[in-house]
Structures are given as C-alpha cells and as structure tokens.
C-alpha cells in the first residue's frame, strides 16, 4: 500500500482526517436515530445491563472499524478500487486474495448479517408507525395493530427493494441518510432532557441544520441546483462543512429555542399518560387465565 500510495498510511493526511471527522458525526447521528438501538435500550432489564452492554460494544467496535479500514487500504494498494467500487472494497479484497471457498463463506456471513440488520430496521420502522397510529386513535384493537404492522413491514421492504434495484451507490445512500440524521439527532436527544424545548423549536433547529447541510452536500448538488435562483448562492460543496454545519447549526438553533422557550414539559406526566398496549384499560378488565366451557 505504501509503494502504491504513501498517503494511505499517513496519519497526517488531511483529506483522510477530514473524512474521519465527518464520518464520526455521520455515524453518531445515524445511531442516535437508529430505532433498532432504541428497541434494545428499552429491552434491557435495567440500567446496569444497559451501561455494561454499551461499554462492551464500544470496546468491541474499535478493532472492527480498524480492520474494516485496513481492508480499504489493502484494496487501494492492490489497485482494486475505482470511484464506482470504493463502497465495496471489502468484497474486492476478499474475492481477490482469499480462496473461492473462503470467499463464499465470508459473503454468506455478510448476507446473514445484512438480513439480520434489515429485519431489525424493518420491524423498528413499522412498529414506530404502528405505535403512532394507535396513539392517535386511528387503529384500535391488538389484531388490527398486528395486521397493520405486518403490512407496513411488507411495504417498507418493497420500497427498499425498489431503491436497491436502481443501482445507487451504497456509500451515497448511507451518507445522504446520515446527513438527515446529523441535522436531527441533537434536537431529538435534547428534547428528552430540556423542559423548555417546544416542538417548533426542535423543528426549527432540525430544518436549519438540514438546510446548511444540504447547501454543502456534494451528492445532492445536482438536485438542489434545479431550484430556480438557488444555484448561484450555494457554497463550494464539501463533506466536512456539510456534516459539521448540519450538526452545529441545529445545536445552536435548538439551544436558542431552549433559552427563549417558556413552555415547560412535565416529564413526570409520562408515567401516567403513557402505558403499554398490553396493559388493560379501565373498560377492559384483565384476563384471569381461566378457561370456561
């Protein structure tokens, strides 16, 4: 790798440092909005278990990310990477270096991993929408909610298949979604703790951050320039200011919204206003488990 491109292992290579910095904001925002992670948070049997799980995961992910990065370095050193294939550098190295049998096993494990992640995300998205519909009173009854959840899972899966069939860059899709997450996650998390943050304040912070991020984001430049009168006002596209701007501006606007906000949300009300769908209502007595003839 060093003989091919000395910058691949140069710790002071500025483009590499910039990439690592904005990827931190991208992944942080994406994970804060990852409903699969929030499901695991609420599935933990207590705070000690949750802290221990996050600690083990944080220690485990470091060597995994380092190893994944080295696969990219190896792919570049072997001359396997092009702008169109840089997002699949891992598979390029596997198919080039490893025997076919080992490569098949690796690809099979990766497919199983993707299926597991997709299953988590599909269920998380459909359950999120289902819960909101139940909260709004649009759907009543456990059976109707189950059918709706299954139907939403199928629709989301079909949408993912349609998008995947277009041949878009995996890296481009991830970074586009991460930009949205980078602009939204601070108002979302801040709202869990700040009593003075209103819905409008959180929305203003999210939209302001997203506007700045899109203005700099290179991958959406072609779409943004289609808006009349916008093209000449856009700054030079760059990833680092896109993600830093999205997170920083949303944080700043959200902080201002908290400072000027007067509506105080009572978090104690959650214990009385929020209940599990499995809990019986006042009109519905709990089941006794007895079976009558």
Indicate where each model-derived feature is located.
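Membrane-embedded helix-loop-helix hairpins and adjacent transmembrane boundary segments
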Residues: 1-293
